[in-house]
Structures are given as structure tokens and as C-alpha cells.
């Protein structure tokens, strides 16, 4: 499958740059055009390379020196898709081989027709390496071709300089290199570029370039290859020397492309969700999601995690949110369990920062930061951008009240432990995380009469701030503390306090209309018509008509909140309750968060409303792949891509994991004939093949595995074939 751009359009330039990112979990390079265009945002990012600029509240994922720019002249005329006559154009990101390729047939001012092809690919074997290539072929007359490219340390984060130059060097006539250091975090960056031709070099102002000039005869090609090596002091000592040494090994573009193709061929064979149905778009959306989940996530480094935009852009400053554990980690848990473990180790290694945040708020245990970067301290700014009309700044309440993140982490620990049976992790790390987060909730609850409540919080719905007894928060806190008791994560006195908490914590239950209140006041607030706002999800257009404080006093939800609870704890709620609440809260939810629609789709599946579920799923697919030209300018929506995977696996395929038991009750939409996918469970690699008539489950291991299918238990040995009941 391919992501395709059929026509060059400046309006879409940054959206395609995000969509067409290449990477390998260590770095990501935005799919920006090789030439400079107005408003284009370039970007290369390395996992974990953060810096806190002078005077800034928050650390930022550093936009590293640019390496993809080609400044091309044909007979002295600058190559530009904006100023030249473009006769043919196509740009594709081939998801099956990881290559971004652009073809342009242009006509120069002198009337010469010239093909210009640019390609790039990230090395999937040596994660520090990428390959770039430009091929220029005159079709009608000979041409003079001049190309300049290099390493540009003048790159910034939205105008903020993050790097200082340490050294610029050349080696021979085909290798340039640069050394930089982040201004505050003092991370060393080494970059080298090796060419297949001899160049002329120039270095100035944090930038080093190589220039190449040739007279090219008609119907012959000028081919320039550039092999990039990126190293940082987070992984290596003396990254400058390491990058130079690697670049001197002289691999070719073709060699890197071939091993990338081999890697991706194996990846798709082992991990693809395959959908046969009416629309090829569904398959593209799932491949797009899996591709980006794979290139945004570090494979073997527990010191780093996944930011809200992955490695595709500067949005949210590259910070790590609850999204990672709840929406992204499950993909890896059931495909690459070791990667899921590393994501949990990232949190464990920053436990002291969470303990400090709890102390800062006068609580016990560990309160994990709402936004995390490299240190483990809270990175959420205290105030939002300046309101130019009022001259004031809106308080950002997330860090102070969106405390469910600690329970979310405990939930993820439990998901990992039951899926892998990794007792070593549980004993050495998991119990500590569960204990510390449980201790936080014991101190966070307040006594009201003869029971406990949790006040002044924000649930997943960020349009509803500082409310009491948010159902999602209370239930997840209860679940968190119950895990401490389950695993005896603490001394007898602590466990006694946990049991008291479990006995006395208020858990909202359905009222006489069978509705579970999202919080103490939500259902008593005024209701307004949300039709216009729901037609523009993700735009936060309601804030153009209402102040945030006014929205807070309405039955308006930004995203799945109570419905998120139904999704995470399905065993707690009957199907009639789920149906009643899903319908009610869907009408109150604008889906201004990219995380929302896929979760509502899962719950629609669980109440057998398949066409509604499929409609919600397809709308979720359009968040990054839809027609809005600016939906992804600052990067793709990382967690929403994880949510698409969740929707197919836990929604349409009907998989549930409860108390260490794996169950499946498939519910395919009418548009799908067949779906197949792999799933790793307790060290067994399973393959599910689901049609409207049959359920086939295969496994390669010898041990018998119990599994529930449509409520009936089976013992899976090698293969289980069952006829479908109903749809």
C-alpha cells in the first residue's frame, strides 16, 4: 500500500510532510519537499533528544539539523515545483518497503524537459543511518546540473535555536560531518554525510555544504547519493567520531533500500492486519497506522518513549502523555511484547520524578507527570498562549488535576503482566509501580460522611475541569488500588488501608435512567445542540462561541470519557448499560480529540451496532488521511493510530482480555468479508482468520491454550475451525 500525492499543492505541504515521514524508532525524518517552499516545516527528530530553551517552561523534542535539502539548478535555473512548468508529478511513500519517492517531469525556461527523481529511506538494520538519492535526466537536450546539499544546523523549533555548533569537518572529497550540542540538556549530536561523488565544500554559521556540478547529456542521468549517519550521546560516547566512522564504510543507497525492503517484508508478513472488503481505504488506513506505530517507537531502548506526534513533528513539543500506555502500548504488547515492556520501563526509570510531583502537591506515592520528556519531571506549562484580546493567559489545568494518568499506568502494568506472565518484571518493577500509584490514590481521596470521594479532577474529557467524582478516574483509581491488594504490593498496614479504600470509595452507578454520571454535576448541566460542532470534529470550534468556563458548565464532552471507562473495564458493565450510556454520551461528545471516535466505535461493536461502529471507525481513519489540508501539519496523531488498531482487534474482531483469559466474539461490518491478524498471548503466536461464516484460530506452539469463542471455552492445540453463529 502507498500514501500518494498526485499533485503538488502548497496548502497540503506540511500535512504530507507528516504523513510521509520515514524512520526506524531511533529517528524520524519528515517527508518535506527537498526544496525550500514558503511555510514548509522541515524536521528530523531523534527519540529522547529534548532540550529546554532559555526561559522556557518545558523541554522540547529538538528539531535536529536538516539533511534532506537539495538545492538544484538546471542551466542556472533553480528547480522549483512552484516556479517551473510541471508536466508530471507524483510522490509516494511505499509502506511496504519504507521508501519515499518523488517523480517530477518539468520544463525549464529554455524549454528543456527534464526528469527529477528524489528518494529517501531509513535504514532498518543500522538505526543510525538513512539514505538519500537524486537522479536528474534531461530528455530533450543536454543540461548543466548543479546540486548543493549538506548538514544545516540552523534548523529551529518554531524559531527557537536549540543547538550550538561544536565542530564542522570534511574528510577527503566525499564526506562532511558536523557536531552540535543542545543548549541546556547538553546532549551531543554527531552527523556525517557520505557521497558517491567528489564535492566542493563550504562551512559557515552551523552549516556545512557540498556542491556538485556536471554537464549531463540528453537521455543520460546524473545520480547523487547521500548516506546520512546520526549519533547522539544518549546512546553512544563521542557520537561525532561514531558517525564519521560509520559513514566511511561506504554503503550504497541500493544496499540500504534492499535491507529496508527485507525488514518491511518480514514486518508485514508477521504483523499486518489484512482486511478484505468493499474499500481498499480500510487496508491503507491500517497499514498507515502500523507503519507509523513501528517507526515512531524505540525498539530496544527503555530510556525513551513515544510522544504525541511520534517522530513526525513538533506538536505538543514531543511530550509523552497517557496516550502511550492506553492507546499505543497495546499494539506492541500483542505484537512485540519486549517493546511494550520498554515503554513501562521508561516510566519506572522516572519514578522519582513522579514521587516528587506527588510531594509537591502534598500527596503520597507517585503522581506521574501529565506531560513527560527526558527527566521525569512535569513538563506541562502552567499557562497557555497569550490571549491577544485580553492580554491574559489561560491556566493549563492538566498537570494540576488530570491525575488519572497514574491509574492508567497501573492499568498498563496489569495488561502487560497478564498478557506475558512476566513474573520477573512484576516482582522487580511492576509491584513498585502499582504500590506507588496506589499510595497516591490513598492520599488523594477525601472522606465525605462514611465514604471516600475524589475531588477536583479532570477526566479524559478536557472540556470538563475541576469536577468531583469523575467516573473514569474513580473506577480506574479503584482498579489501581485493587491491583495492590491482588499482588500484595505493600506491607500489611498498607494493604489494610488499600482494602478500606476499596470498601469506601464512591463508584458512580447507573441512575434510574440507567445513565452513569460522568461526574457529580454533568447530568444536571444544560444541554445544547452540538450538531454544528460535531460536523467539524477536531477543530475545537465550540470555543469560538463559548469561553472554556462556559463549556465547563454544559453537557459537552471533548472526547470519550465515560465511554472510555466502558472500553477499559468491559467486565464491569452489562450490555444494556453500555448501550444506554454510549448513545447518551455520543450525543454530548464533539470528538475534538483524535482519540475519541475509535473508542466509541469499539463500544458500538460491543452492542452489535455494526454499521454505526464502521461509520465511526472510518471517520477515525480520516483524522490523518482525510481531506483537511492542515489536520496533521505539526505531526501525525500517534495515539489515534494506535486506537485504529484497537478498534479492529477489540471492536470488530471482538477480542477481550479479562482476568488472564482470552476471548473472541467477532462482529464484522457488512463492508468486510474477511479479516486476519496475528496476536501474541502468553508467549503463543496466534493467527486469527475471521469471515462471516467461519472463525479460524491457528498457533505454532505445542502447549494447549484455553480460549473462549462466543462464550464457549475451547482448548486450542494447533488449529481451531468454527462455524459462525449469526453475523
Where do the protein language model's features map onto the residues?
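Carbohydrate-binding/catalytic loop surfaces
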Residues: 307-319, 362-394, 451-471, 516-530, ...
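C-terminal capping/lid segments that line or modulate ligand- or cofactor-binding pockets
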Residues: 14-38, 43-45, 327, 373-375, ...
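Acidic/polar, glycine-enriched structural segments that form the non-catalytic walls/loops
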Residues: 1-316, 546-550
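Helix-terminus loop motifs that line ligand-binding clefts
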Residues: 297-312, 338-411, 417, 424-428, ...
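Non-catalytic C-terminal accessory modules of carbohydrate-active enzymes
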Residues: 56-109, 115, 394, 575, ...
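Acidic/histidine-rich catalytic neighborhood
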Residues: 436, 440-493, 497
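Inter-helical turn/loop segments and adjacent helix faces that build the functional surface
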Residues: 141, 234, 274-275, 334, ...
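Active-site core of glycosidic bond-cleaving carbohydrate-active enzymes
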Residues: 321-352, 402, 428, 482, ...
Amino acid at each position: 500500500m502507498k500514501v500518494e500525492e498526485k499533485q503538488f499543492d502548497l496548502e497540503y505541504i506540511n500535512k504530507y510532510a507528516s504523513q510521509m515521514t520515514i524512520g526506524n524508532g531511533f529517528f524520524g525524518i519528515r517527508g518535506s519537499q527537498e526544496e525550500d517552499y514558503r511555510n514548509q516545516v522541515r524536521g528530523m527528530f531523534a527519540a529522547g533528544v529534548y532540550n529546554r530553551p532559555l526561559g522556557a517552561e518545558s523541554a522540547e523534542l529538538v528539531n535536529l539539523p536538516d539533511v534532506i535539502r537539495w538545492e538544484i539548478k538546471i542551466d542556472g535555473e533553480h528547480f522549483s515545483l512552484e516556479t517551473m512548468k510541471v508536466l508530471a508529478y507524483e510522490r509516494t511513500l511505499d509502506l511496504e518497503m519504507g521508501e519515499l519517492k518523488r517523480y517530477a517531469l518539468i520544463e525549464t525556461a529554455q524549454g528543456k524537459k527534464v526528469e527529477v527523481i528524489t528518494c529517501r529511506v531509513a535504514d532498518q538494520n543500522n538505526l543510525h543511518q538513512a539514505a538519500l538519492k537524486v537522479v536528474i535526466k534531461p530528455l530533450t537536450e543536454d543540461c548543466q546540473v548543479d546540486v548543493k546539499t549538506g548538514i544545516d544546523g540552523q534548523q529551529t523549533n518554531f524559531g527557537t535555536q536549540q543547538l550550538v555548533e561544536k565542530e564542522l569537518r570534511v574528510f577527503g572529497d566525499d564526506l562532511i560531518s558536523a557536531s552540535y550540542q543542545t543548549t541546556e540538556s547538553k546532549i551531543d549530536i554527531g552527523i556525517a554525510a557520505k557521497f558517491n561523488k567528489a564535492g566542493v565544500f563550504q562551512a559557515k554559521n552551523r552549516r556545512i555544504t557540498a556542491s556538485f556540478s556536471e554537464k549531463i547529456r540528453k537521455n543520460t542521468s546524473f545520480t547523487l547519493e547521500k548516506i546520512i549517519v546520526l549519533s547522539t550521546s544518549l546512546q553512544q560516547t563521542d557520537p561525532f567520531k561514531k558517525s564519521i566512522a560509520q559513514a566511511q564504510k561506504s554503503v550504497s543507497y541500493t544496499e540500504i533500500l534492499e535491507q529496508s525492503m527485507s525488514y518491511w517484508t518480514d514486518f508485514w508478513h508477521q504483523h499486518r492486519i489484512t482486511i478484505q472488503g468493499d474499500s481498499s481505504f480500510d487496508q491503507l488506513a491500517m497499514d498507515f497506522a502500523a507503519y507509523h506505530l513501528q517507526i515512531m517507537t524505540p525498539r530496544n531502548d527503555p530510556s525513551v518513549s513515544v510522544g504525541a506526534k511520534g517522530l513526525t513533528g513538533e506538536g505538543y513539543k514531543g511530550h509523552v502523555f497517557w496516550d502511550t500506555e492506553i492507546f499505543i502500548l497495546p499494539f506492541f504488547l500483542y505484537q512485540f511484547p519486549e517493546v511494550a515492556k520498554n515503554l513501562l520501563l521508561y516510566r519506572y526509570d522516572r519514578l522519582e520524578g513522579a514521587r516528587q510531583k506527588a510531594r509537591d502537591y502534598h500527596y503520597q506515592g507517585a503522581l506521574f507527570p501529565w506531560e513527560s520528556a527526558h527527566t521525569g519531571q512535569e513538563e506541562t506549562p502552567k499557562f497557555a498562549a497569550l490571549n491577544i484580546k485580553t492580554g491574559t493567559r489561560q491556566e493549563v489545568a492538566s498537570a494540576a488535576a488530570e491525575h488519572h494518568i497514574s491509574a492508567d499506568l497501573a492499568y498498563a502494568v496489569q495488561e502487560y503482566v497478564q498478557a506475558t506472565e512476566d513474573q520477573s518484571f512484576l516482582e522487580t518493577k511492576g509491584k513498585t509501580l502499582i504500590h506507588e500509584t496506589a499510595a497516591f490514590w490513598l492520599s488523594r481521596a477525601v472522606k465525605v460522611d462514611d465514604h471516600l470521594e475524589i475531588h477536583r479532577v479532570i477526566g479524559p474529557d478536557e472540556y470538563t475541569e475541576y469536577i468531583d467524582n469523575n467516573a473514569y478516574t474513580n473506577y480506574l483509581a479503584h482498579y489501581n488500588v485493587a491491583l495492590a491488594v491482588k499482588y500484595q504490593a505493600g506491607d500489611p498496614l498498607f494493604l489494610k488501608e488499600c482494602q478500606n479504600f476499596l470498601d469506601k470509595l464512591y463508584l458512580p452507578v447507573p441512575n434510574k435512567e440507567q445513565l452513569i454520571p460522568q461526574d457529580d454535576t454533568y447530568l444536571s448541566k444544560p444541554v445544547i445542540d452540538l450538531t454544528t460542532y460535531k460536523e467539524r470534529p477536531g477543530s475545537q470550534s465550540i470555543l469560538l462561541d463559548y469561553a472554556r468556563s462556559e463549556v465547563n458548565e454544559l453537557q459537552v464532552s471533548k472526547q470519550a470519557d465515560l465511554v472510555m471507562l466502558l472500553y477499559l473495564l468491559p467486565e464491569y458493565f452489562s450490555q444494556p448499560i453500555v448501550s444506554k450510556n454510549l448513545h447518551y454520551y455520543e450525543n454530548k461528545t464533539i470528538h475534538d480529540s483524535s482519540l475519541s471516535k475509535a473508542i466509541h466505535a469499539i463500544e458500538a461493536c460491543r452492542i452489535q451496532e455494526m454499521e454505526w461502529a464502521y461509520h465511526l471507525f472510518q471517520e477515525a481513519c480520516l483524522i490523518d488521511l482525510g481531506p483537511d489540508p492542515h489536520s496533521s501539519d505539526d505531526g501525525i496523531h500517534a495515539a489515534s493510530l494506535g486506537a485504529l488498531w484497537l478498534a479492529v482487534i477489540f471492536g470488530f474482531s471482538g477480542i477481550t482480555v479479562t482476568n488472564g483469559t482470552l476471548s473472541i466474539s467477532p462482529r464484522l461490518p457488512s463492508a468486510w468479508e474477511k479479516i486476519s491478524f496475528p496476536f501474541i498471548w502468553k508467549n503463543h503466536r496466534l493467527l486469527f482468520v475471521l469471515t462471516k461464516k467461519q472463525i479460524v484460530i491457528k498457533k505454532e506452539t505445542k502447549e494447549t491454550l484455553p480460549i473462549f469463542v462466543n462464550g464457549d471455552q475451547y482448548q486450542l492445540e494447533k488449529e481451531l475451525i468454527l462455524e459462525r453463529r449469526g453475523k
